[in-house]
């Protein structure tokens, strides 16, 4: 019996500037910009890469969700993996934004959930992961219910959610946690 081995290769969209500091002298050609990053992602798409990670930074660089939305008509096959820092965007708005983008890319969307501190915060790890857990619960509720009533430690609201449903009918985009 033989097993076929396969590997899924992803690419990195340098939408956050400054990640190349550790490479030595910074090359101005690699500075984060819409034009440069768009070309990189289009090339990765043409070369058959499966995914592209779109990182998030609250200090410098482009916004990952805005970048992915803008790239929808610039690519054909590549799956987008934007990093989402929990707590940065109000969860009902985040659910609606993600559902909209998921329709724009026709399901070529996976989410990288980040549980880091926000600017000026110094929450212990446990609290950050609890907040992320609430955000994930809220996203799932907004993607599956027409009205959401939620009471948690970090968020509390009663809001309609229709029609903020993702393109992917299996409960929304796949989530990676980091």
Regions found by a protein language model. Give the residues of each.
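Flexible, glycine-rich active-site loops centered on histidine and acidic residues
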Residues: 2-31, 90-155
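A short, GP-enriched loop/loop-strand-helix hinge that lies immediately N-terminal to
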Residues: 79-85
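Short beta-strand and adjacent tight-turn residues that come in two discontinuous sequence segments
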Residues: 54, 83, 111-114
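N-terminal beta1-alpha1-beta2 module of alpha/beta enzyme domains
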Residues: 1-79, 167-175
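Glycine-/small-residue-rich active-site loops that bind phosphorylated ligands and cofactors
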Residues: 59-60, 86-90
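Short hydrophobic "strand-cap" motifs at the C-terminus of beta-strands
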Residues: 55, 85, 178
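Generic, ordered loop/turn and secondary-structure boundary motif
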Residues: 85, 149-151, 155-158, 168-170
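Extended catalytic-interface subdomain
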Residues: 131-142, 157-166, 174-178
